[in-house]
Design a protein with these regions (language model features):
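Short linear motifs at protein or domain termini
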Residues: 1-66, 175-184
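Residues at secondary-structure transition points
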Residues: 2, 13, 33, 40-47, ...
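A generic membrane alpha-helix/interface feature
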Residues: 19, 118, 127, 138, ...
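Mobile beta-alpha loop/short-helix "lid" or hinge segments that flank ligand
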Residues: 24, 28-29, 119-121, 136-138
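Conserved amphipathic alpha-helical segments that form helical-bundle/coiled-coil interaction surfaces
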Residues: 67-129, 142-150, 158-168
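Short amphipathic alpha-helical interaction/hinge segments
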Residues: 124-134, 171-178
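C-terminal effector-binding regulatory domain of bacterial HTH transcription factors
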Residues: 156-184
Length: 184
């Protein structure tokens, strides 16, 4: 932390606080007197994160379902159109986060949305590595469009099923990226 503070001309305290925050979010492993490194979740951690995502996102979707209106549905469609136009991995991931936040936003559950973001962060690193052009992009786009349609129709059971399939496909990508990094 001393080197980072010196390089950026800031005191050590905010650097330590930032590193502690990254560590608490599971993004950084700190070995005292040895430094820090970016953490790599293991397959079991990925599975646990997705199990939790199923619970949190399923609940958010169910609570948001009856609260969407024409404006929010148009916004979901606009976000999905922009997402399909994204041509880089990081742009695609930020667009996907925006889509899901708009999908769940009408639930008006800020703590659940914060938990959704926290559960997603370690997964997105590995999805970003595995997501090449067209790798799964069309499948995700189709699932998003089907989610919009089922939300517009108020079909809770179909929306839940599509979300579960969507998260399972993403789990598969994240696990493949995790095992590709030599983690198990």
């Amino acid at each position: 932390s001393d080197l980072i503070a010196a390089e950026y001309g800031v005191s050590r305290i905010p650097v330590r606080e930032a590193l502690a925050q990254l560590q608490s979010e599971g993004l950084l492993e700190i070995a005292h007197y040895r430094g820090a490194r970016v953490s790599r979740p293991r397959a079991g951690e990925i599975d646990e994160l997705f199990d939790l995502r199923q619970l949190v996102e399923g609940d958010l979707l169910a609570r948001a379902l009856g609260r969407h209106d024409q404006r929010s549905l148009r916004e979901l469609t606009r976000l999905q159109d922009a997402l399909e136009d994204a041509d880089d991995r990081l742009g695609w991931i930020s667009g996907d986060i925006a889509f899901h936040e708009a999908l769940y936003g009408p639930a008006e559950r800020p703590r659940s949305l914060a938990l959704f973001r926290q559960l997603r962060a370690p997964i997105d690193r590995f999805s970003a590595q595995a997501l090449g052009p067209g790798a799964r992009k069309q499948g995700w786009a189709d699932e998003h469009r089907r989610l919009i349609a089922t939300v517009a129709a108020g079909d809770a059971a179909a929306a839940r099923t599509i979300l579960e399939q969507h998260l399972q496909a993403t789990r598969t990508i994240a696990l493949a990226a995790c095992s590709g990094d030599g983690e198990s």
